[in-house]
């Protein structure tokens, strides 16, 4: 104890943050007491704080928080109150802190992903932050009577607002004081200054509640002034006499003086209690008030003496130090008090007693623990120097250091972020204050404490600069006049206030009275009651908190469990797949092996049969040769029989082979793309012998197979049918069918039946014996006769064979016929018995008829008569029906014969009619050709160096003079022409007349159009010129064109102008890249310049080329005003205003000249386009209207336009029907809808494929002559001299092992023969299956990963994972913390964790662990340095250390340090002994060992220094043989053979305590250990080098060794190998080598694909190879396409352009690329041709090379062959090639299914299929089956077309509508498509599913 009566606690262990089980208790907390001195405090701002102040603030932020109390939840304790209590020390004003206050703070090291466990918040503390500005959130005010922690910020404003609050109950007994937030600023108690000469004016009165501006907060919202935040409120009267909340009373300012004898340390009931305020105390002030001046002399200024004993409030205050930057006001927590300031005579408030002196101490600051009686006062010392800190024991200091959290490598104390934020509560019931002596039994009403503000005030920091003077103000503001609002200065501080002398005197008197009356209180009684009340309140508050937190925990648990269940459900699915995957794979493999075995058996069986057939044929030939050479007739007959037998056997074998090889039974059907997929088996073909080759039953009869009929039975049936037909024709009656005789069986008794059966058996046996004897006798006689006739040398053979055959026949009869005969006999017996029974019944009726002569007989007679009449009527009806059927059959036969004759006559007529139509068209073309001279224009610019095409034949033009006389009338009615008997001259004259009329009509139409424009010109609407009469003129390049046209382009312009002059439409079919766009623009420029025709012109183009057209027109003819007609509906509505003006004159000043739009918008806005009269309509990429059935074709045909121009580089894409549609579009009057002409044009040329004949030369010439005038086509090699030919190379690739496995698996799952047979029959149901199969095979050829991608594999993670932060929201740098947590958590209560629950952790409640640690590890440990030093002399225990080169301190550290610390220290040691072995390597020094290392034998012989001499070269390999051998073995680079099935983070303790979080972070993220394992970072090493730090000061090098496995590393996550991804595909491997070569040579590549999924995979490959690329496919937006093409054209660093063949092959210019690669080819050659011409076009200066990757021996070879055939058709038709064009392999459209099926077969199978098909065709069965199939309507599968399969998810590039539009042509007669579109019941306009043929036609581009 010191002289003031304080118990010294310097040696007591202070509680620390991190101590387990250490719930902060007042009795166990160390306290240092300082003398209170007078200091002048000056206000400082944050920026002006001294270093010591800041350090003090940080160091004392959590001085009272224990390690386990970081989550301070409750201060309730059931332990008995301690008799001893030490008051807390006060920190010095300068911010000096004590060592025992340097406790650890909470570390909020929780990542974004892993929020920490929320601790139970203290109901009496507020959430706080470490910043001195403001709190995290408003905190819950402490309940009445409970201490509240200070403000979150380190300002006194928050302290006073909370501590000086009225209405709080008195401080009661408690086991532990209220906890303080670890981040609260230190509560320092400052002795006030000694200046007493300054007068303080009284403060101005304030309203009860008023908001004020707080400059320290970041909000503009005014805060409410709490009653506790009033000026002058002190700890003494903070809670005294609390008025009702919200109605505070005004206070009277006062000043007082006091002598030293008033500080007698008596307790409450001791009778000598004095004021607890020391003489040197300043009165604490509100943060709203200014610093008060010192009172004048004579006032109650406290003398400069220390009190003998601190007041109970001081002793029971918190240990938190005051922030040195505060106002100097006391931050001691408020305690309940019933004292109130004196007031003028008025009724006392309800919260005070009725004693004479309301300031008595009967209810002031009771403690929860009754303190002992204070001792007598010691002499008062006026001023005493500050007590210095006492040094704590070493153990305590070490424990404190251990309790700190390792934030970085050096542990630093940081302010703790308290995440526990409370909501303020209004406590409904509070303990009543104890009555005074006069009114002990009068209960005081309970009052609710006022709400407190939790925000800090920066004004406190500012007020520190003003001198302070302690003043005490009563909580009761009972001034007679209300206080006015305080005036504020400019900086937000209130103006200073002064006290009146009268008020100070009143206060002095009142306080003296209080001190005198305080001795009569009974402390024991008072404390007991208050203690119980507070305990009861704590229990109530805790129960409420438990309920609240229970709800939150339940919600959190429900969410957690739901997530677990979802996760386990997903994992269960994965486990199921993993468990049964191997089983399924094993089963599939077994089936595959079985199927392969069966297929091999079938092949062996086939080879054996073929060999047997060959041997049999050889035997036949030999037998025939012997028969010819035989002289004897018998021998010759024998040889002939042998030959016949051999021939029959060969025929049977041949039939078996023709039926096909029966494949193995398959239970697994392939279905790789979804949808239903049939399986075709050869068994179906065999079952088809019963009638239908398809093997399908016709009716719903027996489910089993039909009985097979022999060939003889079939022939007999056929003969009988022919005989019956002949009899019918001759009028004879057919013979009646033989009926089985009815045998009546009479029922007998059992005895008779038994007798009869015995007789029957005997007779039957006898009969059989007789029959057998007769037969054998006859047969013997016959055999004998035959044997006699046969030569002797052949008798022995014939008899034996005959007997065998005879026996075989009888065996067959016994096996087959006996059972049937028995069944027939049984049936006949049953029928016989039934008839006999009926006969008996009838006989009995007849016998009794005389007895039944009544009315009933009459009725029966009538019924029988009616029945007889009905039977007769039925008989005659049947008879008449049969006669009628016979008559109809005869009439039908006659009609059929007449139809055949009529068909023959009609065929001849149609032939002449077709000839007439062709002649008419030829004449028209001849007349037009002479005017337009297309042939001259086409070849006038040919390169003379290029030889004439070898296939080009001389066209023999028609030598016909153009008639000059009057034009004969047009023959429109073909019925007037006699095609049967009319002369050829008359037909020719009619054809010439029609041709002339067609020309005249075209010209008249143009003149009418122009004249109409002239007529309308008068009204000011249109202004068209009439250039028709200008004739043939040679024109020059228009000056409006800002470019120089080439010669061939100028010729093309002349041709187009001549077409326009004649009013004829045309097709500009120049090869792609020759400038069709420029030529069409030049025509419009010519019309504008020469004839002042400025439009309107309409350009319709695909959506991808709209921007290109707009740019080209603006570039070449800037004077044209372009209307870009695209966009949304609202945008187009605005654009249409340009042509909706009725009085628009299309001159140069017109609103627009050229309208550019797309095909889709033309169809959607057809009504608006048809209103306009277009001068010229240009259709770019005219193959978009190649189908005359499409809606766009008919919509464009109905537009009002003078001329039409079609631009296409590929006029023929798939068949001639497309070219017919284009010609019909440009000349509807000539190429009209005559079916004969269309059929000849489209089908007759291709029909030769059925018979594999060659095209007729005359027909080809006539076809070319028809096309010549209307179509102008030039090719690049003829007109473009500087553009060389493109080089096309086919690169054949082989299937890899994985691809072969996939391919063979697919082949084994299907039966090619069945597919072909069903496809030949035209079964639509199987067309989807065929297309699906084609897609699967093409996927295999491209890459097997298209079926199944190799995914990233990892063990099953038994852990929780937090959500990953969004890189889009957070940026590139995202803080990713440790968030993995095990699914298994060890729940541990907080009390067990902290309060001695862990016995191995030392703490206040676990003294055993502390005693063990101190005793065993320190006192009784022999490894202490002192003991080692004492035992090192002589031969004592540790004398060996001097030979082991170990000091006592090193030995102590080795036994007391952790393993990682020792390992790091060993790593830092320099191996001096090993290097000595290197230095002293001579023989004489080999055994040299220093004296201090005699026992270190192993380090002396260490070879590691030798191995570490060098790290490279041969010497390094010699010194590290084992490591080099391991590296060369490649074991570290192999794929891991296995991986763990599951992984999980360590199981952790789950405790609602910050201490557990600290320990976890200490274990998992220990900064020193991480630094030791991983070493310095790259940035640190750079800094060390730049700073030139000495090597001995460098940190420890990395201790973590490199992983043994290079690929695996330290993780179990396996990433798929990209190298394997490349080598799994033969195509990709070839492409990899090719791209490497092209890149090195500086080429740029266009890479085309058919499948968008393959483009996705190719992007991964290009990223892997670091090739720069860009991509364009059907899903690319319109605006992005333009930018992508521009980037590739302008940025040479882009190496590859990935394109979809359909999307990237139209209308874009990519001339910067010189290499084109087709990863997979299209079966339409024009699509590929368009794609490669993106680079091979005008502007290309390099040699263009085209590579085509084809997989050898697969379906791709056959698709390529088919494309080449189509290419040849185009060349022949368009260029007029020679007549030797072989169309072998071509198929009619209806046989396209068969072509696709043939692609799936190999060469051997294809040959067999051809042979089988030929046999079926010869036998006529094929036609029968096709007729049967045609009679059935089958519902088409709604499956996707091949085109859609290729480009799934890509979208339609040209945005065209593909709906079938009803009629094919505008003819009057309805076509089948028309009738189909209407459907039944008038369902017009409904969407009908396309048939498989239509889908195939779409895939080939034949229709839309």
UniProtKB/Swiss-Prot annotation:
User: A cellular component term (GO) from this record?
Assistant: Ino80 complex
Chain coiled-coil ranges: 590-655, 706-783, 877-922
Helicase C-terminal domain sequence ranges: 1630-1789
Q: Which GO terms describe its molecular function?
A: ATP binding; ATP hydrolysis activity; ATP-dependent chromatin remodeler activity; DNA binding; histone binding
Q: Which UniProt keywords apply?
A: Activator, ATP-binding, Coiled coil, DNA damage, DNA repair, DNA-binding, Hydrolase, Nucleotide-binding, Nucleus, Transcription, Transcription regulation
Extent of Basic and acidic residues compositional bias: 383-428, 435-445, 635-647, 710-721, 751-764, 780-792, 1814-1825
Question: Main localization of the protein?
Answer: nucleus
Where is ATP bound in this sequence?
Answer: 1070-1077
Q: Which Pfam families match?
A: DBINO, Helicase_C, SNF2-rel_dom
Task: List the InterPro entries hit by this protein, alphabetically.
Answer: DBINO, DEXQc_INO80, Helicase_ATP-bd, Helicase_C-like, INO80/SWR1_helicase, P-loop_NTPase, SNF2-like_sf, SNF2/RAD54-like_C
Biased segments, Low complexity type: 51-70, 92-111, 148-158, 1863-1873
| Subcellular localization(s) per the UniProt record | Nucleus
Q: Where is this motif: DEAQ box?
A: 1180-1183
Q: Does the keyword Nuclease apply?
A: no
Query: Residue ranges under compositional bias (Pro residues)?
Result: 176-189
Any idea where the Helicase ATP-binding domain is?
A: 1057-1229
Q: What is its EC number?
A: 3.6.4.-
Start and end residues of each stretch annotated as Disordered? 1-501, 594-792, 1814-1904
CDD domains in the record: DEXQc_INO80, SF2_C_SNF
Biological role stated in the UniProt entry: ATPase component of the INO80 complex which remodels chromatin by shifting nucleosomes and is involved in DNA repair.
Give the family this protein belongs to, as stated in its UniProt record. Belongs to the SNF2/RAD54 helicase family.
The record comments on the domains as follows: The DBINO region is involved in binding to DNA.
Subunit-structure text: Component of the INO80 chromatin-remodeling complex.
Q: What is this protein called?
A: Chromatin-remodeling ATPase INO80
Q: Record the organism.
A: Gibberella zeae (strain ATCC MYA-4620 / CBS 123657 / FGSC 9075 / NRRL 31084 / PH-1) (Wheat head blight fungus)
Gene name, Swiss-Prot/TrEMBL: INO80
């Amino acid at each position: 104890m010191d002289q003031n009566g304080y118990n010294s606690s310097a040696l007591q262990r202070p509680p620390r943050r991190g101590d387990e089980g250490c719930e902060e208790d007042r009795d166990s907390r160390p306290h240092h007491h300082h003398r209170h001195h007078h200091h002048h405090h000056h206000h400082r701002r944050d920026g002006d704080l001294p270093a010591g102040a800041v350090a003090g603030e940080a160091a004392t932020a959590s001085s009272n928080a224990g390690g386990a109390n970081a989550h301070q939840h409750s201060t309730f304790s059931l332990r008995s109150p301690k008799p001893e209590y030490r008051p807390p020390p006060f920190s010095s004003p300068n911010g000096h802190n004590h060592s025992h206050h340097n406790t650890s703070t909470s570390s909020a090291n929780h990542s974004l992903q892993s929020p920490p466990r929320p601790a139970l918040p203290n109901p009496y503390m507020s959430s706080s932050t470490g910043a001195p500005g403001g709190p995290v959130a408003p905190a819950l005010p402490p309940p009445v009577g409970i201490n509240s922690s200070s403000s979150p910020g380190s300002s006194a404003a928050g302290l006073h607002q909370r501590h000086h609050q009225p209405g709080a109950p008195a401080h009661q007994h408690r086991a532990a004081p209220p906890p303080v937030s670890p981040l609260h600023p230190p509560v320092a108690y400052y002795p006030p200054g000694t200046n007493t000469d300054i007068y303080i004016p009284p403060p101005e009165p304030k309203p009860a509640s008023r908001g004020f501006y707080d400059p320290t907060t970041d909000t503009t919202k005014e805060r409410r002034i709490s009653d506790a935040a009033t000026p002058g409120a002190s700890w003494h009267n903070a809670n005294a006499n609390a008025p009702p909340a919200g109605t505070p009373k005004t206070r009277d300012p006062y000043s007082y003086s006091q002598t030293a004898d008033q500080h007698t340390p008596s307790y409450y009931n001791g009778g000598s209690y004095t004021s607890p305020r020391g003489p040197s105390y300043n009165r604490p002030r509100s943060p709203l008030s200014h610093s008060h001046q010192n009172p004048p002399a004579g006032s109650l200024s406290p003398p400069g003496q220390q009190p003998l004993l601190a007041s109970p409030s001081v002793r029971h205050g918190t240990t938190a130090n005051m922030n040195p930057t505060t106002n100097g006001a006391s931050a001691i927590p408020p305690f309940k008090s019933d004292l109130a300031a004196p007031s003028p005579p008025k009724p006392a408030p309800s919260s005070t007693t009725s004693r004479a002196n309301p300031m008595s101490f009967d209810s002031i600051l009771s403690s929860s623990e009754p303190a002992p009686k204070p001792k007598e006062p010691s002499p008062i010392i006026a001023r005493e120097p500050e007590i210095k800190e006492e040094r704590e024991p070493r153990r305590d200091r070490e424990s404190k250091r251990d309790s700190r959290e390792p934030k970085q490598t050096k542990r630093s104390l940081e302010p703790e972020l308290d995440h526990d934020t409370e909501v303020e509560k209004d406590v409904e019931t509070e303990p009543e204050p104890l009555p005074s002596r006069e009114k002990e039994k009068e209960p005081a009403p309970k009052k609710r404490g006022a709400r407190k503000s939790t925000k800090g005030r920066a004004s406190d920091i500012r007020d520190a600069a003003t001198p302070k003077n302690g003043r005490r103000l009563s909580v009761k503001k009972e001034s007679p006049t209300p206080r006015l609002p305080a005036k504020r200065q400019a900086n937000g501080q209130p103006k200073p206030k002064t006290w009146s002398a009268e008020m100070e005197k009143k206060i002095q008197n009142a306080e003296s009275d209080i001190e005198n009356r305080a001795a009569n209180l009974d402390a024991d009684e008072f404390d007991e009651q208050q203690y119980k009340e507070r305990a009861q309140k704590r229990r109530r508050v805790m129960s409420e908190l438990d309920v609240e937190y229970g709800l939150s925990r339940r919600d959190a648990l429900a969410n957690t469990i739901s997530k677990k269940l979802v996760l386990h459900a997903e994992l269960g699915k994965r486990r199921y797949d993993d468990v049964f995957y191997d089983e399924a794979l094993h089963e599939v493999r077994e089936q595959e092996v079985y199927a392969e075995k069966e297929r091999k058996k079938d092949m062996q069986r086939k080879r054996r049969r073929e060999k047997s057939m060959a041997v049999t044929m050889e035997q036949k030939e030999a037998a025939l040769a012997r028969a010819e050479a035989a002289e004897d007739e018998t021998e010759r007959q024998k040889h002939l029989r042998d030959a016949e037998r051999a021939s029959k056997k060969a025929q049977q074998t041949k039939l078996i082979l023709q039926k096909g090889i029966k494949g193995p039974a398959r239970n697994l059907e392939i279905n790789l793309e979804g949808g239903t997929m049939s399986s075709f088996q050869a068994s179906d073909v065999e079952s088809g012998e019963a009638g239908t080759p398809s093997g399908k039953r016709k009716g719903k009869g027996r489910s089993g197979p039909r009985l097979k009929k022999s060939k003889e039975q079939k022939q007999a049936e056929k003969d009988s049918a022919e005989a019956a037909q002949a009899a019918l024709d001759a009028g004879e009656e057919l013979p009646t069918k033989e009926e089985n005789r009815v045998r009546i069986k009479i029922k007998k008794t059992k005895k008779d039946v038994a007798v009869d059966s015995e007789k029957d058996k005997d007779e039957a046996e006898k009969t059989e014996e007789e029959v057998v004897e007769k037969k054998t006798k006859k047969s013997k006689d016959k055999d004998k006769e035959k044997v006699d006739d046969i030569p002797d040398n052949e008798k022995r053979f014939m008899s034996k064979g005959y007997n065998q055959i005879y026996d075989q026949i009888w065996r067959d009869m016994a096996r087959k016929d006996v059972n049937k005969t028995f069944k027939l006999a049984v049936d006949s017996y049953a029928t016989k018995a039934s008839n006999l029974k009926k006969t008996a019944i009838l006989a009995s009726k007849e016998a009794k008829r005389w007895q039944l002569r009544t009315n009933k007989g009459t009725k029966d007679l009538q019924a029988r008569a009616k029945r007889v009449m009905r039977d007769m009527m039925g008989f005659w009806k049947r008879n008449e029906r049969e006669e009628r059927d016979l008559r109809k059959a005869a009439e039908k036969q006659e009609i059929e014969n007449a139809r055949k004759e009529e068909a023959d006559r009609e065929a001849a007529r149609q032939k002449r009619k077709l000839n007439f139509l062709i002649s008419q068209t030829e004449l028209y073309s001849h007349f037009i050709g002479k005017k337009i001279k297309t042939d001259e224009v086409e070849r006038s610019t040919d390169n003379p160096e290029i030889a004439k095409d070898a296939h080009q034949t001389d066209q023999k033009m028609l030598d016909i003079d153009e008639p000059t006389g009057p034009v004969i009338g047009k023959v429109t009615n073909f019925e007037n022409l006699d095609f049967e008997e009319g002369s050829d001259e008359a037909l020719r004259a009619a054809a010439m007349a029609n041709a002339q009329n067609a020309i005249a009509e075209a010209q008249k139409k143009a003149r009418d159009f122009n004249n109409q424009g002239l007529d309308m010109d008068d009204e000011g609407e249109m202004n068209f010129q009439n250039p028709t009469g200008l004739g043939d003129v040679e024109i020059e390049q228009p000056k409006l064109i800002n470019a120089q046209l080439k010669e061939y382009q100028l010729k093309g312009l002349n041709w187009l102008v001549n077409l326009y002059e004649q009013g004829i439409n045309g097709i500009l079919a120049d090869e792609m890249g020759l400038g069709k766009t420029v030529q069409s623009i030049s025509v419009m420029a010519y019309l504008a310049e020469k004839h002042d025709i400025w439009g309107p012109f309409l350009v319709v183009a695909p959506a991808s080329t709209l921007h290109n057209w707009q740019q080209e027109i603006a570039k070449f003819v800037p004077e044209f005003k372009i209307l870009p007609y695209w966009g949304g509906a609202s945008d187009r509505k605005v654009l249409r205003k340009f042509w909706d003006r009725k009085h628009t004159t299309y001159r140069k000043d017109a609103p627009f000249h050229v309208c550019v739009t797309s095909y889709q918008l033309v169809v959607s806005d057809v009504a608006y386009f048809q209103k306009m009269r277009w001068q010229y309509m240009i259709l770019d990429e005219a193959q978009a209207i190649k189908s005359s059935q499409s809606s766009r074709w008919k919509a464009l045909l109905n537009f009002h336009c003078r001329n039409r121009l079609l631009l296409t580089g590929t006029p023929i894409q798939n068949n001639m029907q497309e070219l017919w549609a284009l010609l019909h579009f440009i000349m509807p009057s000539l190429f009209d809808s005559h079916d004969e002409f269309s059929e000849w044009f489209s089908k007759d040329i291709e029909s030769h494929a059925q018979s594999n004949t060659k095209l007729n030369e005359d027909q080809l010439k006539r076809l070319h002559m028809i096309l010549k005038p209307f179509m102008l086509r030039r090719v690049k090699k003829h007109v473009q001299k500087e553009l060389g030919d493109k080089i096309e190379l086919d690169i054949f690739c082989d299937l890899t092992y994985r691809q072969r496995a996939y391919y063979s698996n697919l082949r084994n799952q299907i039966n090619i023969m069945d597919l072909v047979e069903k496809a030949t029959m035209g079964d639509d149901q199987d067309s989807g299956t065929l297309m699906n199969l084609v897609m699967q095979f093409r996927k295999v050829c491209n890459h097997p990963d298209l079926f199944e991608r190799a995914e990233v594999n990892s063990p099953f993670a038994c852990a929780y994972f937090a959500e990953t932060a969004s890189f889009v929201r957070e940026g590139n740098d995202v803080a990713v913390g440790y968030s993995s947590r095990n699914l298994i958590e060890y729940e541990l209560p907080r009390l067990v964790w902290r309060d001695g629950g862990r016995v191995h952790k030392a703490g206040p409640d676990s003294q055993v662990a502390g005693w063990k640690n101190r005793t065993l590890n320190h006192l009784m440990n022999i490894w202490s340095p002192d003991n080692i030093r004492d035992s090192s002399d002589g031969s004592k225990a540790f004398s060996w250390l001097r030979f082991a080169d170990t000091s006592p301190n090193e030995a102590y550290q080795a036994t007391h340090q952790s393993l990682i610390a020792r390992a790091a220290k060993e790593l830092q040691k320099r191996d001096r002994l090993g290097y000595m072995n290197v230095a002293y390597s001579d023989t004489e020094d080999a055994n040299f060992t220093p004296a201090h290392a005699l026992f270190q034998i192993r380090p002396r012989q260490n070879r590691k220094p030798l191995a570490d001499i060098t790290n490279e070269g041969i010497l390094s390999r010699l010194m590290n043989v084992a490591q080099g051998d391991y590296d060369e073995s490649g074991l570290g680079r192999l794929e891991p053979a296995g991986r763990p099935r599951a992984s999980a983070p360590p199981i952790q303790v789950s405790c609602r305590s910050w201490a557990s979080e600290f320990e976890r972070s200490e274990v998992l993220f220990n900064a020193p250990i991480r630094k030791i394992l991983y070493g310095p970072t790259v940035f640190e090493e750079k800094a060390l080098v730049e700073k030139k730090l000495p090597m001995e000061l460098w940190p420890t090098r990395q201790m973590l060794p490199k992983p043994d496995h290079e690929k695996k590393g330290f993780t179990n996550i396996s990433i798929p190998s990209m190298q394997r991804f490349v080598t799994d595909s033969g195509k990709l491997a070839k492409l990899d080598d090719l791209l490497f070569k092209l890149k090195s040579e500086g080429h740029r590549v266009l890479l085309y694909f058919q499948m968008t999924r393959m483009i996705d995979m190719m992007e991964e490959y290009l990223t892997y190879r670091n090739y720069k690329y860009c991509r364009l496919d059907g899903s690319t937006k319109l605006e992005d396409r333009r930018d992508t093409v521009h980037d590739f054209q302008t940025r040479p660093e882009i190496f590859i352009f990935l394109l979809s063949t359909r999307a990237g092959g139209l209308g874009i210019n990519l001339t910067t690329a010189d290499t084109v690669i087709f990863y997979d080819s299209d079966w339409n050659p024009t699509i590929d041709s368009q794609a490669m011409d993106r680079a091979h076009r005008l502007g290309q200066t390099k040699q263009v090379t085209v590579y085509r990757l084809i997989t050898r021996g697969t379906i791709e070879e056959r698709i390529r062959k088919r494309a080449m055939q189509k290419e040849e058709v185009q060349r022949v038709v368009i260029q007029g090639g020679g007549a030797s064009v072989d169309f072998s392999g071509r198929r009619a459209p209806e046989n396209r299914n068969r072509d696709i099926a043939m692609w799936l077969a190999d060469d051997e199978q294809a040959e067999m299929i051809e042979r089988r098909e030929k046999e079926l065709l010869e036998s006529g069965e094929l036609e029968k089956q096709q007729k049967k199939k045609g009679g059935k309507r089958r519902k088409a599968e709604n499956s996707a077309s091949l085109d859609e399969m290729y480009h799934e998810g890509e979208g339609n590039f040209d945005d065209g509508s593909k709906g079938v539009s009803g009629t094919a042509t505008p003819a009057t007669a309805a076509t089948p498509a028309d009738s189909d579109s209407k459907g039944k019941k008038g369902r017009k306009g409904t969407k009908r599913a396309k048939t498989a043929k239509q889908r195939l036609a779409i895939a080939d581009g034949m229709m839309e």
